[in-house]
Amino acid sequence: MKKSILTLIIISLFTIQSFAQPRADALVLYRNGKYAEAIKICEQEIVEDPQNIDSYCVLCWSLVRNRQYAEAEQRSAEARKINSTDVRLIEIQAEAKFYLGKNTAALELFQYYLANVPANGSRIGNAYYYMGEIYIRQAKYQHADISFSTAVHTEPLVDYWWTRCGYAREMTGNYNSALEAYSKAIELNGSNSDAIRGRERVVAKLR
């Protein structure tokens, strides 16, 4: 009898402990690069609360970082049926479309994001960077220069953005400004081979 009671107590304590364990934080998982795990948690949260926009945002961020672009596009569209003006959803939907090669749609969404996001928005620099890449794809190099220049003004410590800014300027024939951008990229990251080659090209053209 005593053994049976003891067994029941142990089972009860184990059950209580299991239910008491908090679910992993999807945002923390995302920030730690555990995208697949974050996706699973977000999917569970959305099943429990289909109106949970925060879960949709983390889900879509994780899908994009996990290179599941088509699914990110689909899920962000679902979320925007619930809240069409959430700037986080607008921006990540634009990213998904960018990676799917849907340049016009992505550009329109990035522009819409920038028109509506507060001045302290965390993805402003990224939006301008992606716009610059779209303009490069479209061979609109002056537009690309403007976008990349705004991106590096917003976040001046990203060496790759300076490299792309240098490339856009190089393609417009603005070699002095291209040299400045490539040099800044190398200053931030001395092993940036694209920036090193870019600087060599424009230095040769300036001779």
Can you say where each PLM-predicted feature lies in the sequence?
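N-terminal leader/linker segments that initiate helical-solenoid repeat arrays
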Residues: 18-54, 207
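Register position in tetratricopeptide repeats
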Residues: 31-32, 65-66, 99-100, 133, ...
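Structural marker of alpha-solenoid helical repeat scaffolds
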Residues: 48, 82, 116-120, 154, ...
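Helix-start (N-cap) detector for alpha-helical repeat units in TPR-like alpha-solenoids
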Residues: 53-54, 87-88, 121-125, 158-160, ...
